[in-house]
Amino acid sequence: MAVNKGDFIKIEFTGKVKETGEVFDTTYEEVAREAGLGIKKIFGPIPVVVGGGHLIKGLDEAVIGMEEGEEKHVEIEPEDAFGNRDPKLVQLIPMGEFKRQGIKPYPGMTLTVEGHEGRVLNVSGGRVRVDFNHELAGKTLEYDLKVKEIITDDAEKVKSMIQLHYPSQNMDIDKTEVKIEDGKVIIHMDEMTRFDNRSYMDVTLARFRIARDIWENIEGVEKVEFADVFEKRDMEAEEKEEEVEDAGED
C-alpha cells in the first residue's frame, strides 16, 4: 500500500546540509551522538499526517507514493525546505533594548524578539546584528528517509498524534486508552504524564493540536474529549506485586 496525502504514517530520517554534509536532525540516537547534536529527549520513528503541515514541503511530497518499509534518498531545494535567505530579516537592534531586559547578547546567542527567534551575528558600536532567518534558510538539504509504518487503525492514529504533540519520557503509549464512538473520541492519557513539568498553557496547546489533527483527518469525528480519571488503589497490593516481579528478575 502506497502512502497518500492524509495518511497517518511513522517515518525515520537523517537530514544533512548538502554542501557540508553536516547532520542537523535525525530520529536515530546513535547518529545524533556521532554528529555531536544535542541529545533529544525522545528518539525513534516520528508520527505525522501526510500533508498535515508536520513536515517541510519537500519531505511531505517525498513520502507520497512510498511503500511501508521503503527507503529513499531525497534532495530538497531551499524553496521546498526552510526558504531562501531574506536580507531584510537581518536587523540592527540598539544595545539599549537588550540592557532594559537584562540581556547581554553575544555572537551565536539565540533569542526571541517580539515573538521572532533570531541569532546574534555580532555586537559592535552599541548595536547588535540579529539574523531572523531560519538557520537552514538558503541551504539545499539531503534526507535519508524511511517509511516505517502506515497507520490504518483509527485508535492508533489518535495515539500517533498524542506521541507527536505530547512527547514524554514518562508516557507509556500502550497505557493510553482511546475510545471512538458516535463521532466522539475519548482519550484517557497514561496517568504518568501528570508528572511532566509542563505549564497549563503548554498542556492545553498540545491537546488542541491533537484534537485538531484528529477531527481534520479521521472521518466522522466531530469531538475530542480528554478524560482525567483518578482511581483509588490498593498501594500495598501493588508494592507486593512489584516485589514479586523484582524477585523474578534476580
Curated annotation (Swiss-Prot):
EC numbers on record: 5.2.1.8
Alphabetical GO biological process terms: gene expression
Biological role stated in the UniProt entry: Catalyzes the cis-trans isomerization of peptidyl prolyl bonds and accelerates protein folding. Also exhibits chaperone-like activity. In vitro, can use oligopeptides such as N-succinyl-Ala-Leu-Pro-Phe-p-nitroanilide and N-succinyl-Ala-Ala-Pro-Phe-p-nitroanilide as substrates. The PPIase activity is much lower than those of other FKBPs reported against oligopeptidyl substrates. As a chaperone, protects green fluorescent protein (GFP) and rhodanese from thermal denaturation or aggregation, and suppresses the aggregation of chemically unfolded rhodanese and elevates the yield of its refolding.
Region (IF), start-end ranges: 85-136
Subunit structure: Homohexamer.
Catalytic activity: [protein]-peptidylproline (omega=180) = [protein]-peptidylproline (omega=0)
Renumbered residue ranges of the record's region CTD: 157-250
Entry's free-text remark on domains: Contains an N-terminal PPIase domain, an IF (Insert in the Flap) domain and a C-terminal domain (CTD). Aggregation suppressing activity against chemically unfolded protein is exerted mainly by the CTD while N- and C-terminal domains contribute to thermal protein aggregation suppression. The CTD probably contributes to hexamerization.
Record keywords: Chaperone, Isomerase, Rotamase
PROSITE patterns according to UniProt: FKBP_PPIASE
InterPro entries for this protein: FKBP26_C, FKBP26_IF, PPIase_dom_sf, PPIase_FKBP_dom, SlpA/SlyD-like_ins_sf
Family label: Belongs to the FKBP-type PPIase family.
Phylogenetic placement of the source organism: Archaea, Methanobacteriati, Methanobacteriota, Methanomada group, Methanobacteria
Name the UniProt record assigns to this protein: Long-type peptidyl-prolyl cis-trans isomerase
